[in-house]
């Protein structure tokens, strides 16, 4: 067998025939992977690497090191840098110092909130109640009515007629006869007064009264040639007008006739139904109270039946018919002013004057026979008047 003749310029390093392949695409044999390798410069096999891998001055592979990273004995290590608050360095561990309302929860930095602050949809917000709104990304007062803002943006109270703001006080702006010091009052002159019920009232003297329409008229006590005529108030009624044990269970007739400083009284009562038709008690009393002007107050007698005899008008301001408060002191449990004893049957009657703390009153008392209808005989009494 004839040996193949080897050319004198044969190169045993791959690629073998460089002269026939002047453009060498890759210097590694086809059975070697090109991963991690490259031809740089052409015809030279070299490693392919990127940062942080590099070579040193001795053409040895090494790493690029940043700040706080060192290579000691072939090992990489990190050096925790010097920190400033709120960062901390403890045992080569970097941390974050927090104080309320900032905290760390579930490895996350959180913000602790309390009402009215809240966190909604990962956003810090504020809850507003009545009187507050959020306008133009700011919390604002929501005024209404007389409240408003002045030129400096301060909340103020708008005052209209009759009121004004003086310094830090809201005061009444009044004119006479009104007066406002600690409270609103009314200056009164002669002829006017304020009643216990807080009403402005005209003070009436002798000979004057109010009619049913509230107008001032001459009273029923008329002076004729220097002699005072007799006047009468009574409770005459064809229908039941008195409620003792139940509604309208009796008919009460009371007649007061004035003559000078005295009043002659006549009274009779008749039970019409219920317990008054068959008495269980051995006594019965009826109290008629009046205010300081002689007006009948709420009691057993229907006030609509208490009228002047002469005009048939409802009696009002009958001060001239009231028991004298000096002769008959108020709320005294003294002996009754009059007493009448009937012999057949034996019925006792008495009347007590001004058994009341204020104003005037008549308290009529009768004895009764249990088991029988209550209908005592007519009684007569006399007393001295207030005027």
Swiss-Prot record:
Alphabetical GO biological process terms: adhesion receptor-mediated virion attachment to host cell; cell adhesion; symbiont entry into host cell
Its Gene Ontology cellular component terms are: host cell nucleus; viral capsid
Primary location class: virion
The protein's matches in SUPFAM superfamilies, at most eight in alphabetical order, are given as: Fibre shaft of virus attachment proteins, Virus attachment protein globular domain
Q: Where in the cell is it found?
A: Virion; Host nucleus
A Pfam family of the record is: Adeno_knob
UniProt keyword list? Capsid protein, Host nucleus, Host-virus interaction, Late protein, Viral attachment to host adhesion receptor, Viral attachment to host cell, Virion, Virus entry into host cell
Q: What induces it?
A: Expressed in the late phase of the viral replicative cycle.
Tell me more from the record. Answer: All late proteins expressed from the major late promoter are produced by alternative splicing and alternative polyadenylation of the same gene giving rise to non-overlapping ORFs. A leader sequence is present in the N-terminus of all these mRNAs and is recognized by the viral shutoff protein to provide expression although conventional translation via ribosome scanning from the cap has been shut off in the host cell.
Task: Tell what the record comments on domains.
Answer: The tail region anchors the fiber to penton base capsomers, whereas the shaft, built from several repeated motifs, allows the knob to protrude from the virion.
Family per similarity comment: Belongs to the adenoviridae fiber family.
Q: Summarize subunit and interaction data from the UniProt record for this chain.
A: Homotrimer. Interacts with host receptor CXCAR. Interacts (via N-terminal tail region) with pentons.
Its job: Forms spikes that protrude from each vertex of the icosahedral capsid. Interacts with host receptor CXCAR to provide virion initial attachment to target cell. Fiber proteins are shed during virus entry, when virus is still at the cell surface.
Question: Mind telling me what this protein is named?
Answer: Fiber protein 2
């Amino acid at each position: 067998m004839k040996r193949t003749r080897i050319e004198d310029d044969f190169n045993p390093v791959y690629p073998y025939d460089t002269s026939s392949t002047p453009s060498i695409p890759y210097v590694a044999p086809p059975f070697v992977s090109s991963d991690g390798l490259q031809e740089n410069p052409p015809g030279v096999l070299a490693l392919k690497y990127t940062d942080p891998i590099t070579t040193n001055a001795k053409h040895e592979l090494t790493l690029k090191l940043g700040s706080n990273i060192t290579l000691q004995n072939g090992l990489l290590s990190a050096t925790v840098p010097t920190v400033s608050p709120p960062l901390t360095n403890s045992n080569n561990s970097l941390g974050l110092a927090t104080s309320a309302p900032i905290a760390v929860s579930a490895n996350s930095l959180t913000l602790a909130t309390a009402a009215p602050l809240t966190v909604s949809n990962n956003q810090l917000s504020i809850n507003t109640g009545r009187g507050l709104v959020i306008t133009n990304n700011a919390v604002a007062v929501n005024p209404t009515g007389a409240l408003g803002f002045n030129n400096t943006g301060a909340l103020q109270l708008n005052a209209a007629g009759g009121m004004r703001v003086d310094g830090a006080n809201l005061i009444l702006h009044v004119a006479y006869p009104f007066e406002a010091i600690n409270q609103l009052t009314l200056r009164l002159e002669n002829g006017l007064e304020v009643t216990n019920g807080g009403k402005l009232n005209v003070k009436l003297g002798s000979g004057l009264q109010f009619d049913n329409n509230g107008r001032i008229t001459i009273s029923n006590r008329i002076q004729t040639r220097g002699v005072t005529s007799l006047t009468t108030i009574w409770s005459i009624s064809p229908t039941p007008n008195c409620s003792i044990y139940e509604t309208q269970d009796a008919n009460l007739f009371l007649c007061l006739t004035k003559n000078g400083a005295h009043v002659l009284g006549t009274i009779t009562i008749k039970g019409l139904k219920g317990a008054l038709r068959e008495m269980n008690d051995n006594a019965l009393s009826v109290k008629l109270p009046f205010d300081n002007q002689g007006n009948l107050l709420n009691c057993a007698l229907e006030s609509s039946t208490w009228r002047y005899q002469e005009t048939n008008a409802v009696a009002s301001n009958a001060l001239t018919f009231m028991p004298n408060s000096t002769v008959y002191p108020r709320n005294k449990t003294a002996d009754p002013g009059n007493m009448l004893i009937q012999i057949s049957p034996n019925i006792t009657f008495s009347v007590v004057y001004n058994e009341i703390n204020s104003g005037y009153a008549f308290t009529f008392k009768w004895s009764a026979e249990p088991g029988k209808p209550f209908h005592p005989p007519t009684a007569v009494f006399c007393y001295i008047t207030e005027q």
